[in-house]
Every structure is written in C-alpha cells, then in structure tokens.
Curated annotation (Swiss-Prot):
It is a single-pass membrane protein. The lineage of its organism: Archaea, Methanobacteriati, Methanobacteriota, Stenosarchaea group, Methanomicrobia. It holds the Pfam family MtrB. It catalyses: 5-methyl-5,6,7,8-tetrahydromethanopterin + coenzyme M + 2 Na(+)(in) = 5,6,7,8-tetrahydromethanopterin + methyl-coenzyme M + 2 Na(+)(out). This is Tetrahydromethanopterin S-methyltransferase subunit B. One of its GO terms (molecular function) is tetrahydromethanopterin S-methyltransferase activity. It comes from Methanosarcina acetivorans (strain ATCC 35395 / DSM 2834 / JCM 12185 / C2A). Pathway: One-carbon metabolism; methanogenesis from CO(2); methyl-coenzyme M from 5,10-methylene-5,6,7,8-tetrahydromethanopterin: step 2/2. Disulfide bonds: none annotated.
Amino acid sequence: MSMIRIAPEVHLVMDPDTAVVAEEREDSILYSMDPVFERMDKLDGIAEDLLNSLSPSKPLLNSWPGRENTSYMAGIYGNAFYGIVVGLAFSGLLALIIFIQRLIEGGM
C-alpha cells in the first residue's frame, strides 16, 4: 500500500488504489505491503507448480516450452521397460522350471 505525498508541508497524502486524499497522521505508522505481496505471488507460483507436478500434462515452472507431456511419456517408457524386464524374468523362470521337470522325468 503506497501513498503519494501531495503536499508534505500540509501533510496531505493520496492513496493511488482508491484515489482518496486525506491528512497524514503523526500517530499512525504506515508500512508498505508491496514486498510481502511480491513474495506471496512468488510462493503462489511455487504452490501452483507443486500442484502441476501431480498432473503429467501440465508444464512445470522450470521446464522449457513444449515439454508438457514429458512426465506422461516418461511414465509410458518406464512402465514398458519394467514390464518387459518382469515378463522376461517370468518367462525365463517358467522355461527353467519346465526344463528341470523334464530332466526329473528322464526325458530330454
């Protein structure tokens, strides 16, 4: 909240937000909230980025333009890789069990 001093010698100030002209009082202290509002806007952007990180289709705060679906594609590739690895491990284990059963039965 900033004040414009219209006439400092007669203590007249104006609030630019409401365009009200008033007498400046000696017994009140006026603090500017602009730095607080700037920090709140920055924190609001960080909180919005935290919420956007939960959605794979939203852009992140520090990412390059055009990388909105990066998390989605990384999830597809990562899950496909682990699916193939688990599938091959299961198939190899199944083949080993079948091979051992045939050895036990005596046929080759």
